[in-house]
Amino acid sequence: LGQVSVDTWTSPTVETTLRGGDENAELLFEYCSASDGAYNISLADALTIDEIKFNCNYTDYFFSRYYGTYTIVANGYPLVIASGVQYSYYTADTIVDGKTCSTSSCYVIGGGLDEDITGGTHVEIYTSLPLTYVYGGGVNGSVESNVYLHIENCGKIQHVRAGGYANKKDAKVNGNITLDFIN
């Protein structure tokens, strides 16, 4: 119930459902960007998120404030972001208290962040997540098996890549990739 601040959290090692208790339930995401190798939520087993708001509060970095940046890393465990998830963050550059608020990139990663995973990935998204980059594979990490990415009834997602993203090291998928879009 209410608001819970999420800086860095590793989910329990059992299948977990994170469900808001009422309309005021919010996850207050601190600034964590995959490009910095940082995450807000890292899975240690299957996770379903439902009936909660992703609220990306700002962090003041000298002259800019960054809104809308969170990173969820599934590490190959099943991740479901259900239709009851809503978002609250700016989607355009805004000025608050005379400072520019830059929109930032959010990430949902099926594989690992700067790590290879030995299994496959399974990510399902049933809601709009503007400004979000969705990777079925890893970011700077390979996936040794199959990738499954299902996106349904999601009015808007910034960028979808069924495989991975390689910047510092390989991000290969050594299996089949299944990408389902249903709108």
Task: Report the location of each language-model feature.
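Short glycine/acidic-rich loop motifs that flank beta-strands on beta-rich extracellular proteins
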Residues: C32-A38, N57-F63, Y90-I95, L113-T118, ...
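Right-handed parallel beta-helix/beta-spiral solenoid domain characteristic of secreted/periplasmic
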Residues: P12-Y58, Y89, T100
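Detector for repetitive beta-architecture
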Residues: Q3, E15-T17, E26, N40, ...
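Short, surface-exposed polybasic-and-hydrophobic patches located at secondary-structure transitions
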Residues: Y61-N75
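Short, surface-exposed loop/strand segments
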Residues: G2-T8
